[in-house]
């Protein structure tokens, strides 16, 4: 078998790593060992933070909805409960956008949630009514 010299492949791999380390500070951008470690770590952070981004955005949407709903005189939890009882299925991202950009439509959603909560309050018997005398 012919002898295979690894210079070409090694150089290509090194170039690839150094290309990914562009913009890094200090030795991490131009020495292979430091660049490889930094690139590996950056990939781990990127993987982790792709998961965290979903949590962060959900929390942001909930905060925005909560602020808009409290202006209407309701809490976030009661609002979500009212929407589910009214049979309205809208995710939090869309609710957040509606609250920001379409205030009238959001007020209508809040009104329908309040209506569903009031209707159920009137029709559901109190569990403690018969027990306490």
UniProtKB/Swiss-Prot annotation:
SUPFAM superfamilies: Ribosomal protein L20 (SSF74731)
Gene Ontology terms describing biological process: ribosomal large subunit assembly; translation
Any one Gene Ontology cellular component term annotated for this protein: ribosome
Keyword GTP-binding: no
GO molecular function: rRNA binding; structural constituent of ribosome
Keywords for this protein: Ribonucleoprotein, Ribosomal protein, RNA-binding, rRNA-binding
Keyword Glycoprotein: no
Role this protein plays: Binds directly to 23S ribosomal RNA and is necessary for the in vitro assembly process of the 50S ribosomal subunit. It is not involved in the protein synthesizing functions of that subunit.
Entry similarity comment: Belongs to the bacterial ribosomal protein bL20 family.
NCBIfam families: rplT_bact (TIGR01032)
PANTHER family named in the record: 39S RIBOSOMAL PROTEIN L20
Name of the molecule in the record: Large ribosomal subunit protein bL20
Originating species: Bartonella tribocorum (strain CIP 105476 / IBS 506)
